[in-house]
Every structure is written in structure tokens, then in C-alpha cells.
Amino acid sequence: MAKLHDKYQETVSPELVKKFGFTSVMQVPRIEKITLNMGVGEAVADKKVMEHALRDMTAIAGQKPVVTVARKSVAGFKIREGYPIGCKVTLRGERMWEFLERLVDIAIPRIRDFRGMSVKSFDGRGNYAMGVREQIIFPEIEYDKIDKIRGMDIVITTSAKNDEEGRALLEGFNFPFKK
């Protein structure tokens, strides 16, 4: 079991019950999934770019990503329907907890000029979305092996009913929000 999962059950969950006055432990917000998405627009011109992006995403997530394709043709972007334009991974269960642990303890502290995560990135239903500008903040990525610095989107989906509950849940995991 991941340390953060144990921490959730032993300390975070009881604290949330006290803070919000839940009558059942099933009402306590929990993290349902973490989705990683990497848009690779350059893959239209060069097929090798997509292979590198898939390799990086596999190393970071620990599971094989799904290639996302263009839904419709856009002449301005020089893409046609069905062209591969990115990749995504949905993490649940054990891998999700392990990724969250690496994100909070290792990756976020390695972000350059970091001043805290924005509180405005909640969507109104307790889910948190963040962008990462470079994949090299993750320890699994070897700096010598990358072809290009790429960013990605990370969405943490929770069962919280509102942003206040979602923020309290993530703060329980020592998520570094701006004060």
C-alpha cells in the first residue's frame, strides 16, 4: 500500500469528518482518479515525436498511454481527422496513490520558480487541474535521453461536492497551495 493511501485512511479522512460534519465515512471526499494528458501537436510533421512523448509518459505514469487522435480536420493547424495529436493516461488505485506521492514529494518541489499551486484551478466540483511546463521534474525522466522539453496537464478527480471540500482533501496530502 502507498503511504498516502494509509495517511488518507488514518488521518485525512477523520479530519475531514470533523471539519465538515459528515455522518458517514462514505460521504468523505476521496481521490477517484488522476489523468495525465500530453498534447503533441508537432507529431503531425514528425512521427518520431509521438514515440518520444509515449516513452516519457510511460516512464512517468508507469503504464502505457492511449494515443489521442484529432476528432475533426483543421486546416489552420494542418491536421486531419484521425491524426495522432497527443496521449493520455488515467491512473486509479495503487498506481494513482504512488503517482500522487511522487508528484507531491518529489516533482512539485523540483519546479523552477515555484511559489505554490493556484487555488483558482478548482472546477467548482472539487476537481483540481494543473499544468506542468516540463517533464524533467519527474525523477523517472533521464535528462540526457529527452529530445525536447514537453509539458502536460494533470487532473486530480475527487468525489468532493465543492471546491472547499476538494481543497481540504488535497491539503491533507500536503499539497502546496498559495496562501
Swiss-Prot record:
This protein's UniProt keywords: Ribonucleoprotein, Ribosomal protein, RNA-binding, rRNA-binding, tRNA-binding
SUPFAM superfamilies: RL5-like (SSF55282)
InterPro entries linked to this entry: Ribosomal_uL5, Ribosomal_uL5_bac-type, Ribosomal_uL5_C, Ribosomal_uL5_CS, Ribosomal_uL5_dom_sf, Ribosomal_uL5_N
Protein purpose: This is one of the proteins that bind and probably mediate the attachment of the 5S RNA into the large ribosomal subunit, where it forms part of the central protuberance. In the 70S ribosome it contacts protein S13 of the 30S subunit (bridge B1b), connecting the 2 subunits; this bridge is implicated in subunit movement. Contacts the P site tRNA; the 5S rRNA and some of its associated proteins might help stabilize positioning of ribosome-bound tRNAs.
MF GO annotations: rRNA binding; structural constituent of ribosome; tRNA binding
Subunit structure: Part of the 50S ribosomal subunit; part of the 5S rRNA/L5/L18/L25 subcomplex. Contacts the 5S rRNA and the P site tRNA. Forms a bridge to the 30S subunit in the 70S ribosome.
PANTHER family per record: 60S RIBOSOMAL PROTEIN L11-RELATED
NCBIfam families on file: PRK00010.1
Family: Belongs to the universal ribosomal protein uL5 family.
Gene name of the record: rplE
GO cellular component: ribonucleoprotein complex; ribosome
Record flagged with keyword Ribonucleoprotein: yes
Disulfide bond entries: none
Any GO BP annotation: translation
Pfam family for this entry, one: Ribosomal_L5
Record-given protein name: Large ribosomal subunit protein uL5
